[in-house]
């Protein structure tokens, strides 16, 4: 047994104990934390590794949904001052960057993803002075800021659109996609959020239709227009000049269109991404954006969505193409279904993406965000018995995979789905419009509500559960959306006091990843790949091999890692009771949702 505790879900396999001791002794991270856990480094970076010094490769990103994080002024809506008041909490997690959902001025049809003014702050959130204070507070604490850039579409209340729809001869007309009605009805395009799923909306003012892939209040911008592109680059420079550290390009894979609008085959809606993503001159626009803005500032860039193939994703983030830095692919998070999911499929998807990016490009690793229901409710088990171990197990997965981890606010507590049973309690435009569509077409509303309870985006947007006081300490007013009813038992204040809570386990995982570069750059190898219950893999780098074993089920499960365990050193376990020591036998039995 080592003279200092190693903290990792798995076993220390390769390299000698003396090697680990020597590396710990020589590490600049050697020291002690308040809970008596040693800090050290396994696998010092070889000379010249990550020589480009890109901070985002070793970053750990914490996503803050501002509307639901912390309300300062008592109006029931989270705001920038509320975030400022909780920066010390965020810093205490050990994360290194914050991704902030849109705070721009917006009529709020889609919770800020319908922007009416890209250079001003939504009044619900505060003022530009508040933003400047927030940014300074983050930088003072060593935290970087990544902002959402929503430029596939704008709000229909943006001045660009007001001018565009005013006249067919308006200089802003081509900022958007229009189809004149005398040409007949435009070829059908599917809308994700429209009540009728029709992406063309007729506008009588100029007797024409405008295109909206999302809600009818989110008209799509026409990136073929040079003047529009320059407007966007100027907006990016405005924020980069303020000192932000990165942009996440929301839905940008859909920005380029074939503006001849050919007819698509019947049923294309079921695979609309193949027809919408990575079309036209998208790469040309990104290369121009890089040349005009990204290359001139010390900012990172991440693409929401990664096209329809590994080649698409590589083309977005291949450094030699001078486009973006990081891919944010949804294949993994899209696996979860109300009836469950196959771990074999889960392993296959994440292994494929890791293999594809092992030597080229850079990936994000995540299982939840503002567009998903809660992590533990979708991929784990949110029952009282298994919520804590399964939430910890899933956190272990995210923090031990290759790529930049993104963690959504509240998931560090193991917050669960709210599971509202009345449509009136849902605020999401997509949920409300789809409910109305089901009602209009005679759909099964009972079944639809069950699907919402499992998968609605609003499950991930309920207020952050700070404590067990009124409104979970989120607001002194009436929250904009109902709280999850279990906030009295699942909250940050309670977990701060418990060294074995989800929150404190998350902090240990974050610190470990930061201190051990094998978890950032190490080779990933899938083990026991046909095991339907356990995800087993190694991370290997610079003479160090770490084994991670994750039971994804509510029953005990056995795994054969395919290697002798006699000399393995246990590092971390997500259970409150310690795991039994490994035996010389290859097979290892894991408790329900155990990470060991």
State what each model feature region is.
Residues 21-596:
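Active-site and adjacent substrate-binding regions of carbohydrate-active enzymes
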Residues 1-3:
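Classical eukaryotic N-terminal signal peptides for Sec-dependent ER targeting/secretion
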């Amino acid at each position: 047994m080592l003279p200092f505790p190693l903290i990792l879900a798995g076993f220390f396999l390769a390299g000698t104990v003396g090697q680990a001791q020597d590396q710990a002794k020589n590490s600049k991270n050697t020291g002690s934390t308040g809970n008596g856990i040693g800090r050290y480094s396994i696998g010092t970076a070889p000379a010249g590794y990550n020589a480009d010094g890109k901070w985002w490769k070793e970053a750990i990103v914490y996503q803050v949904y501002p509307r639901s994080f912390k309300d300062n002024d008592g109006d029931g809506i989270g705001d920038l001052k509320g975030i400022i008041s909780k920066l010390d909490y965020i810093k205490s997690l050990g994360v290194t960057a914050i991704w902030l959902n849109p705070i721009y001025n917006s009529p709020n049809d889609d919770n800020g993803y319908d922007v009416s003014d890209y250079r001003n702050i939504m009044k619900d959130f505060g003022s530009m002075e508040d933003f400047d204070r927030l940014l300074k507070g983050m930088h003072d604490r060593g935290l970087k800021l990544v902002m959402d850039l929503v430029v596939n579409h704008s709000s229909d209340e943006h001045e660009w659109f007001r001018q565009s729809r005013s006249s067919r001869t308006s200089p802003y007309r081509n900022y958007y996609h229009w189809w004149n009605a005398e040409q007949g009805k435009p070829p059908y395009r599917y809308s994700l959020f429209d009540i009728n799923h029709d992406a063309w909306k007729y506008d009588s003012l100029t007797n024409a239709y405008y295109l909206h892939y999302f809600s009818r209040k989110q008209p799509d911008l026409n990136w073929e227009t040079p003047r529009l592109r320059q407007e966007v680059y100027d907006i990016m420079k405005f924020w980069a000049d303020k000192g932000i550290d990165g942009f996440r390009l929301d839905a940008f894979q859909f920005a380029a269109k074939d503006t001849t609008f050919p007819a698509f085959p019947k049923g294309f809606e079921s695979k609309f991404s193949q027809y919408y993503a990575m079309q036209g001159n998208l790469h040309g626009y990104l290369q121009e954006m890089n040349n005009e803005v990204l290359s001139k500032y010390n900012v990172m860039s991440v693409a929401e969505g990664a096209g329809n193939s590994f080649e698409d994703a590589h083309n977005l983030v291949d450094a030699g193409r001078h486009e973006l830095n990081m891919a944010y692919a949804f294949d993994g998070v899209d696996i979860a279904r109300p009836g469950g999911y196959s771990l074999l499929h889960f392993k296959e998807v994440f292994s494929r993406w890791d293999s594809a990016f092992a030597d080229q490009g850079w990936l994000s690793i995540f299982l939840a965000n503002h567009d998903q229901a809660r992590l533990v409710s979708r991929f784990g088990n949110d029952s009282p018995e298994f919520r804590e171990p399964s939430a910890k197990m899933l956190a272990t997965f995210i923090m031990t995979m290759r790529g930049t981890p993104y963690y959504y606010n509240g998931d560090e507590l193991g917050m669960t789905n709210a599971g509202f049973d009345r449509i009136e309690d849902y605020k999401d435009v997509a949920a409300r419009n789809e409910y109305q569509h089901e009602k209009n077409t005679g759909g099964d509303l009972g079944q639809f509500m069950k699907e919402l309870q499992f998968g609605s985006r609003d499950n991930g947007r309920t207020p952050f559960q700070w404590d067990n006081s009124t409104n979970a300490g989120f607001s002194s007013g009436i929250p904009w959306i109902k709280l999850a009813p279990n906030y009295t038992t699942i909250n940050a204040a309670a977990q701060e006091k418990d060294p074995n809570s989800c929150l404190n386990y998350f902090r240990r995982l974050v610190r470990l990843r930061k201190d051990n570069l094998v978890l950032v750059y190490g080779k990933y190898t899938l083990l026991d790949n046909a095991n339907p219950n356990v995800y087993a893999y190694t991370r290997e780098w610079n003479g160090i091999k770490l084994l991670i074993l994750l039971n994804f089920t509510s029953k005990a499960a056995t795994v054969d890692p395919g290697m002798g365990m006699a000399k393995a050193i246990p590092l971390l376990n997500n259970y409150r009771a310690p795991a039994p020591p490994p035996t010389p036998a290859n097979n290892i039995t894991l408790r329900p949702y155990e990470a060991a």
